Amino acid sequence: MGFYNCRFLSRRLSVEPCRIGSAAKSYQQRSIYHFGAALTNAPSGRETPDKLRSDLHSALEMVDEIYDTNSTVEDIGNKEKGGRQKYTEEMDKAINLLKTNIKKEYRHDKYLERTKVGTYPGRRTYPGRRTYPARRTYPASRTYSDSNSYTFRINVQKIRHALVRYNQDGVQKHNQKPPRIGHGLTRVLYQPLSLQKLRDNRSRMYNFDPAVENINPEYLEKKSEKDVNTDSSGEGQSKPIFITPHKDESLLKVAKEHRKKYISSSSSMTSVLSQLHYLLSNFRRLNIIDSSISKNFPQKNCNYSESAYFPSAVILRKKRNGICSIDSDRSLDREIVLSVLGHYLEDFLTEKSLKNSSKSENYHYSSIDEFIVRSQLDAYDPNLPGTGVFDLKTRAVSAIRYDLSHVESNNNQTGYEIDKVYGEFESLEREYFELIRSALLKYSLQARIGKMDGIFVAYHNISKMFGFQYLPLDELDYIIHSSYNSKFDSLLKEKNDITKGIYGEEDYILHYDRDDRKIACLVANREFKMSMNLFSNILKHVEQLLNSSNTKWEKCKIMLKTEVEEKRSKSGRFFNEPVLNIVALPLSPEYEDKSLLVKDTSNEQLTEELLNLRSYNENLLEEHLNSLVGFKVNVKHFYHHHPNTTHLPDFALKKNDILDTESRKYISDMMKRDWYKDIPSTQTPNFFHASDVSTWEVNSTFTDINDKQILRKLYFKYLDVKLNALKNQVITRQEPDMSKKDEIMNRIKSLQARNDHRDNGSNKRYSNFGPTRLQTKLRAYAKKGALRRKLLERSNKFHI
């Protein structure tokens, strides 16, 4: 079959043309993109058949999946002969699917027009029709509604996510494998999700190397960064101190080599991508019903913690060669002992070898859309799927995370310990539940960016290690992307009942049962690509707004927050819709985003520092108020049944003469029924079949906010949220200064008020500056743990 021109789908599909010609792409890839002409020259007034459209999408998805699977660090050309043959066969299979559907099944030869290989018509004219240019510029499929807003299609088909090499001094550096996990912890990797204790309480026997139990206090001391080179090569140390993206010369070189516009690190990107997840998923809830979390915690309606919804703040900086860097805004954060401890614990838990003692490569560089994103390599295991690389996280217990300043004021000591697997407090389960609500989304995004298999978590209380857990990425996807609302649930049950009635229980289980986990993984991957493409468009629009206002800038602060906006339908009904608000403030060249220092600082001094920080940001905003820009982002979802899921069963065909006409018509109507038609386009996207995910497309609308006072209000709103969060991290909430008698009286009065239904929530904490109820509980459990530890040590001395 000959080649066809490269106009990629019809304008009706709103997919940007894809230029093929790179030598890195195989014959099969170039061929399948040329077949995209199938819909370009459709006769006027004729709609593209849905089945043809969906099968073309399906074939392209197959190519994407095959390409992504085979385009990691190693080049296709460097693979062994058997690997290349398998790759070629898979590509041929995708092409043959497309040929069959277009040429044989649908008889749509008239939609195809043969052209020479590599021919890209500049412009084509049809009698009585508009003339369209062969190529379009950013962004794809813009539709302008007025001077302040436009809509475009988020283009997933063109996005490639692959690991790239770093060429240093003209020599291509091969990615060196990170170290293996040590201390006998390898078996944790092969028992995913299991919460595994370091030591058994009953027998006092260790399940892993006892050497990992006690944490060296030296790990709490931050090492000097003055002798560290400003690149990510990490020469001369087993693990490099974190280099912010805008200071990383190696990262800049990779972006220049691969002609990318933006550079960042996975940790700097996750806060933004989290906000985009809330936008694209319409605040999808977490699903822990089928997880290892017991009924000690609420199974339904599990949402993220309050801190997970905090606004994202990043700094966009202009670099050389038209490249921009994206860094987290550290000015609204603090130096935290857990970050320093985590860095050295991650190094401690891995094996030491001569090969890894002086690493020349400590990162994966991921090419995604217009980004090069750097991911730290923590550990590797050859038996894990994919790259075999996984992230290593150390997780402090709840008593530390919810009351960090109190623990720091106590010389980084807490008696709170983990002594069981399950339970509301002092358990691994409690820590896993808190991780799911506050950090799981961030962990999953970091793993996906770096093409890692999963996350290894070590639970500790700064002084001691208590347990371990391995979380594969597909399990994280299931928790984050598999929940659905009651309306979809009722539709799914109705559809399943009908499908069981048509095919029978056995065939339903074997062939038609919904694969929840596969759907969640496909949704996660597609949403991630959409998020990266959307963020690229957001950054370009910020630059465009700043440039159009004649603002000279080298760096700017961007604050993003997805919120719920109440809207009214044409029928008069009110409904909620997610909207992403974006505010960008140009910064002076001398601006530095330094973290707040809290060591050896009193509450009074910290309070003054926070007030100064608020005042500084006020002055900064007033100074650049005229240059302040912003806009809001809305999205609408479009998807439908994939044709592979709507085929009539053989027994319902007329030629088989099994059913009467009425029964055949009933089955035909049921198979053709559009189960998606009543689902609003702004609702959380859910899918009945895994193949339907490939039809998911999103329209995004940018609406400029020209009112400076609205922008000012949004800026201070998000600033105050960040400052309040910072205050809760650094200000120690002291126990109320009252006598035992007064404490008893207050407690009894509060109990009486609750019983008389007169509780107005005032008893959540003893005073405005006292500990919260949860902090009070955790401090009590810490005292209980300290007493238990003393009794155990005394008992051990007695037996000796």
From Swiss-Prot:
Chain residue ranges for the region called Disordered: 219-240
Record's keyword annotation contains RNA-binding: no
UniProt KW keywords: Mitochondrion
NAD recorded as keyword: no
GO biological process terms held by the UniProt record: mitochondrial RNA 5'-end processing; mitochondrial RNA metabolic process
Biased composition (Basic and acidic residues): 219-229
An example Gene Ontology CC term for this record: mitochondrial envelope
Domain of life: Eukaryota
Localization per record: Mitochondrion
Primary localization: mitochondrion
Other observations noted: Present with 1730 molecules/cell in log phase SD medium.
Family listed: Belongs to the PET127 family.
Described purpose of this protein according to its UniProt entry: Could be a component of the mitochondrial translation system with a role in promoting accuracy of translational initiation.
Name of the featured protein: Putative mitochondrial translation system component PET127
Native organism: Saccharomyces cerevisiae (strain ATCC 204508 / S288c) (Baker's yeast)
Species lineage: Eukaryota, Fungi, Dikarya, Ascomycota, Saccharomycotina
